[in-house]
Amino acid sequence: PLNFGVAEEEAKERARKALKLVGLPEDLLKKSPFDLSGGQMRRVAIAGVLAMKPEVLVLDEPTAGLDPRGRREIMDMFYQLHKKEGISIVLVTHSMEDVSQYADKIIVMHRGTIYKEGTPREIFSSPKELVELGLDVPETIRFQLKLEEKLGREIGKPSLSLEELVSNLHLLKTGETGYDG
């Protein structure tokens, strides 16, 4: 913020607020970058951007290289920034787990052009089509497709979460389809 003419005291206040937004303690400002974990370094970098008060964050593979816990924490943080602070987030990722759980809208690119766009439910409603194109689908859907192949029948609508898959399996057991229509 100082480079954009923000007064020093306001810049410090923005930095403190940004650290809080990304879930880091204020005393981290006194630490050497070499003492931070990979996840903390990413959060500090994001806090630096948030101190600028952006309306939109454009993120390219922000969870690459993080362990599952770190990935979930970072994605939860982006989700909260969107919901509580009203920041629009454009996420470029190959992680279908992340988009199925966190995205409001997905744009699928294939060979440099927009192939499909919609909600996670709409995009993953025809997973076999995506797989045939060589695109990935969430792990729960991959598991569901393998299970359906073994059973020789559909379980229900594609499951975007483990909870949905369990619900679809329960519906199958009770003789229902899991489809709304």
Regions found by a protein language model. Give the residues of each.
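Catalytic Walker B motif of ABC-type/P-loop ATPase nucleotide-binding domains
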Residues: L57-D60
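Conserved ABC ATPase "signature" region
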Residues: E10-D27
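Conserved ABC ATPase signature
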Residues: S32-L36, Q40
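Conserved catalytic motifs of ABC-family nucleotide-binding domains
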Residues: K53
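A short, surface-exposed alpha-helical micro-motif characterized by mixed small hydrophobic
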Residues: V99-Q101
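ABC ATPase "signature
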Residues: E117-G118
